[in-house]
Regions:
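Conserved short alpha-helical elements in the N-terminal third of ANL/AMP-binding
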Residues: 2-11
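Active-site glycine/GP-rich loop and adjacent strand/helix microenvironment
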Residues: 10-215
């Protein structure tokens, strides 16, 4: 992000965040401390916005909601929000677009990690009902949605399965790595000619409680 901003003649401002610390606090039921930490992080962002020209924001859903309660993002100059780092249900995406961003600020859900890179989402259409679909950056990364009990089987379109990642770069090859995520297999959609994944969430989210922390 910083490199891209610099190439385009802009600056990039970072707020340090320790999600593992927050997850530990929540697991230990120290909710008041976790809340204080989130407020501390959001306050730093709110301090930067009035004094710098910032139009693009990269953040997580919970932090975006907290920041939106503190400042008017449009008036602060934000024109596009890239949001990821955790699962986002369709109703959460709808709330962000219609309430937080007031249908005026561009919203771009993202999914990814260090091994895959960034899987971009396609523009939401009315028929999507606010369900985001992501496409891996092929050919360096390929996603497959597999039967978690028989991982050599690919599930059908519209079905839930576990995310399988294959990464191939000049320096690194990692075939068929099972991610800690589950998702719906989605069909190809312009401008992408390969399968996508939708409604990504932690693997086993319906069977057990999973702490995602401030993410």
């Amino acid at each position: 992000i910083e490199h891209l901003a610099n190439v385009r003649g802009s600056s990039c401002y970072f707020i340090d965040l320790d999600p593992r610390f927050v997850k530990k606090l929540i697991s230990n039921k120290q909710f008041d401390v976790a809340k204080q930490y989130m407020v501390h992080v959001v306050d730093q962002a709110a301090t930067i916005l009035p004094h710098r020209k910032v139009s693009g924001l990269f953040t997580t859903p919970k932090l975006l909601e907290a920041l939106g309660e503190k400042v008017n993002l449009w008036d602060a100059g934000i024109r596009g929000v890239f949001c990821g780092g955790t699962s986002m249900k369709p109703q959460e995406i709808r709330f962000i677009i219609e309430e937080l961003l007031e249908n005026r600020i561009g919203f771009y859900p993202t999914y990814g990690n260090t091994l895959m890179g960034l899987a971009a989402s396609v523009e939401l259409q009315p028929e999507d009902n606010f369900s985001a679909t992501y496409f891996a950056p092929q050919p360096r990364a390929v996603l497959r949605v597999v039967n978690p009990k028989q991982t050599d089987e690919t599930v059908g379109y519209g079905e839930w399965g576990r995310v399988e990642l294959t990464t191939l770069t000049k320096e690194f090859f990692m075939p068929r790595f099972l991610e800690r995520d589950e998702t719906i297999r989605r069909a190809a959609r312009p401008p992408y000619a390969w399968d996508g994944v939708g409604d990504v969430r932690p693997f086993g989210a319906l069977e057990k409680t999973i702490v995602e922390g401030v993410y």
